[in-house]
Amino acid sequence: MDPDPRRWPGLAVLLLAAFMDFVDVSIVLIAAPVIQADLGATYAGIQWMLAGYALAFGLLLITGGRLGDLVGRKRVFLIGVAAFTVASAWCGLAGSIGVLIAARVLQGAAAGMMVPQVLATIQVSFPRQERPKAYGLYGAVAGLAFSAAPVISGLLLQLDLFGLSWRPVFLVNVPVGLAAFVGAALLVRESRADVPPATDLAGIALSSAGILLLLYPLIQGNDLDWPLWAFAMMAAALPVLALFARYEARRERQGGLPLVPMSLFHQRSFSAGLLCALVVYSAVASFFFVLVIQLQAGHGLSPLQAGLITVAWPVGIGITSNLAVRLAGRLGRRLVSVGALLVIACMLLLVATIQGGEGDLDAWQVMAALLLGGLGMGMIAPILVDIVMSAVPPCDAGAASGVTNTVSQIGAAVGLAVVGALFIAFLHGQAAPAVDAVTPQLRADLATAGVPAAAQDELVAAFRRCALDRAEQQNPPSCQPQPAAQAADGASFTTAPAVRDALVRAGEAARREVFDRAAARTLWYAVGAFALAFLLSFALPPRVRRDEPQPAAVSA
């Protein structure tokens, strides 16, 4: 099949839709507190608003990808974009949390149909030598979207357009979705596998059951304090997924059309690349989770301020992704190895910055570290996708894309589950050391305010009790206790402005200290994950072949 002459404008349209979806994942998380207050939703309701999207998205990625192979990738993409746009409008108009949850589930399902078509269309529309550049653009857009989400969310919430509060967070997708739909209809060429359509219902059922058993406890486990049934579900996922793999392999041997061809996993580039991607995306998702919480809850930055700091990451990706694509033919997997080392250096620099700082973080140091990490990720993302997809025939492009996106989703869920549990545990465990660290300054401030030693002891003890009690909460705020320390004439010392100011400063300092300590310790997960990715990079093929034959695909 001749290359599509409109493939580059068409790719811009596909990436616009992908950007819309990637931003939506994070932008809603940032707006969740405002949504909860406006709709009077319970904490469980907000969790289902977030989890419903993630579950529907994860469940339909493989099915949506294979459906594109069979009935047309452009057709499925257009259906997904249209449904995503309608669901976004429904979210923005929702008057209750129940309606919003239903709309979010539809939105996630639509994204599961839409997103796999992006990589699949790149695979069938671009010649072998152009694909790394296209994958590099895809990786850069993904990195930009995840980092730009706090900026976009912060701006929309701060501007409060037309007095709509949080609703523009969803409604902004409507014009973007319409533009993507029209652009795809005009610029993207239809393609599908040269095989008769056949629905693998058993494969769909088994894969959906296995992914649901795995993803649901990973998404909800931390919020429910990891009940026994969560571990039982994850354990049950293993035999279900094993049965799915066995069934698909048998169907393929018998000449049927499987949902996921197991022969893909016989390719070293596909299986090793997916394993490396699983580890990488578990680290990236959890890293930004910790960083954003630390900047906002720990240091009191607004979503907009935090987002402006994290923009350094996609800037780094943009710098190296194009260079990595040019060097891919000569360096191959070594780019992934070097990129992993750069990201490890980024994490270590962040740990040193957090542990070495006193009071507020140096934003420039954080941005420098993130720029370094982005440079590394720009070497990893496009090359890893190119390696994974390199041995995939066009007839299986959608299935492979769905599997690739599902693995990334599972990796992110695993990373968030592990790091979420670690972060909460460290917040609780580091509360006492954090209070101890700020106590000398609190005593000095109280002495300056004229508080006698005995009253200082009482104030400090009450402050400590309050701070430790607050640390047991999921999101501990600063502590300004109201102890009953009394002067000799019976007046409370806490009524003195200098004393109250000292307690407020100590509370804010303790909050920063406990979040810094927890974040620094939790970041070691990302260090370990990228160290593992570095080792796994040696299992990848040394280079991606550029001269492989191109199986034909039907174009309509």
Language-model regions: role of each:
Residues 87-92, 107, 184, 349-351, ...:
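MFS-fold secondary transporters
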Residues 133-142, 147, 366-465, 521-523, ...:
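Small-residue-rich alpha-helical segments with characteristic i,i+4
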Residues 1-186:
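Transmembrane-helix bundle of Major Facilitator Superfamily
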Residues 8-56, 232, 249-399, 548-549:
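Transmembrane core module of solute transporters
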Residues 158-275, 283, 301, 309:
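Hydrophobic transmembrane-helix bundles of small-molecule transporters
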Residues 73-79, 335-338, 522:
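Juxtamembrane helix-start motifs in multi-pass secondary transporters
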Residues 1-10, 386, 442, 446-556:
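Transmembrane-helix exit segments and adjacent C-terminal regions of multi-pass membrane proteins
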Residues 35-36, 67-68, 152-161, 218, ...:
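Interfacial helix-cap and linker-helix signal at transmembrane-aqueous boundaries
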